[in-house]
Amino acid sequence: ALPICNNLLSAGYVGGNLPLGKLNVYAGVRFEYNRMELVSHTQKNEESPTSVFYTYDDFFPSVNAAYRLNDKHQFRLSYGRTVNRPEFREVSSSVYYDFDLASNVQGNYNLKPAYIDNLDFGYEFYPSSGELISVSLFYKRFKNPIEWTYTVSGGTDLIYSYVNAKGADNYGVEVDIRKNLDFIGMRNFSLSLNGALIKSKVKFEPGAKEKDRPMQGQSPYLINAGFFYQHADSGWNAALLYNRIGKRIIGVGRSLGTADNEVRVPDSYEMPRNAVDLSVSKKIGNLEIKVAVRDLLAEKVSFKQFEETRHGKVEQITRQYK
C-alpha cells in the first residue's frame, strides 16, 4: 500500500537588479522551510502507529551577470544553489512494483536531500529575431546526490532502493543553435540543435569498495534536434523532434554478503537509443486541435550489466523491451 503523507512548504524570496552600463547583475536569495510527514505501510500492509517527520531549513542564493557587447553579442556568468529533496516514496519503507524496471522498489528512511551548486559561463550570439547561437561551460557540485541502487529483501531477492553518495562533480560544454531557414527558401521553417558533453565523477567515503564512476542517471552526452513549421496566417504548426542520450547507469551496483562470501552486483546501464516525436496542430479561432505521435522509431530499450573478470569485461543483456 502507498504511504500516508503530508507536505508543508513555505518560501520567501528577495532579490535586486544592479545595472552598470553594459554589465547587468541580478542577485537574490530564496529561503525555504519544508516539513514532510510520513506514515508508511509494511509489506504486510500494516500501518505504522507513528509518523516520521523530515524538516529542512534552506537558503538558496543566486547571481546572474550579463555583459552585453552590443545588441547581438553578450557574455553570461551565473551561479545558483538548488536542492533535490527525497520524494515520499523514496523515504517510505513501503514496497511498490516498477513496471519499467520489472522489479520491486523500496524507499530509504535515512535518505538526505541532495544540494547542487551550479556555475555557468557562456557566450550568446543573436543573428536575428528568433535566432541564437550559444556556447557555455558548466560545473555542478553535488552534495549527497540521490542514486538508485540494489538491496536484498526476503533473503536473496534483489530490489531497487535509494542511497546518498558522498558527492559528485559534473562539468562540460553545451552548444545551442536556433536558426530560421528563410535563407534557403524555406519560409516558416526553423531548425534547432542542442548538444552537450558531460564528465561526471562520484566521490566516495575513504575505504569504500566502489570505484570511480559517473553519477547514476548521468549520460556522457546529450543530443537534441528539432525541425519546426509555423504558419501564423493558416494556424498550422508542426514539429519533428529527435533525442539521443549516451549510455548511463540506471542502477548502482554494490557488494553484498560478508568478506568471505561477498557477491558483487554490477552496475546496470541503460544503453543509447534514438527517439523521434512528431506533432501537428491547427488553430481554429480560440481552439487548437493537436495530434502527436511519440517514439516513431520504436527502438528497443536495453539494460545491460558489465561484469569484470580476470579475462576482461563480460557483457550481459539483462532486459529489453519496446
Predicted regions mapped to residue ranges:
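Outer-membrane beta-barrel translocator domains and adjoining extracellular loop/strand segments
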Residues: 1, 37-46, 88-94, 101-102, ...
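C-terminal beta-signal and adjacent terminal beta-strands/loops
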Residues: 143, 232, 244-259, 281-322
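Gram-negative outer-membrane beta-barrel transporters
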Residues: 138-141, 159-252
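Extracellular loop and loop/strand-boundary signature of outer-membrane beta-barrel proteins
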Residues: 1-3, 44-52, 104-109, 158-165, ...
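Residues that define the transmembrane beta-barrel architecture of outer-membrane proteins
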Residues: 6-10, 55-59, 115-119, 167-173, ...
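Structural signature of Gram-negative outer-membrane beta-barrels, strongest in the C-terminal barrel
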Residues: 5-141, 228, 241
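Outer membrane beta-barrel strand-and-loop segments of large Gram-negative receptors
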Residues: 3-6, 108-112, 118, 129-192, ...
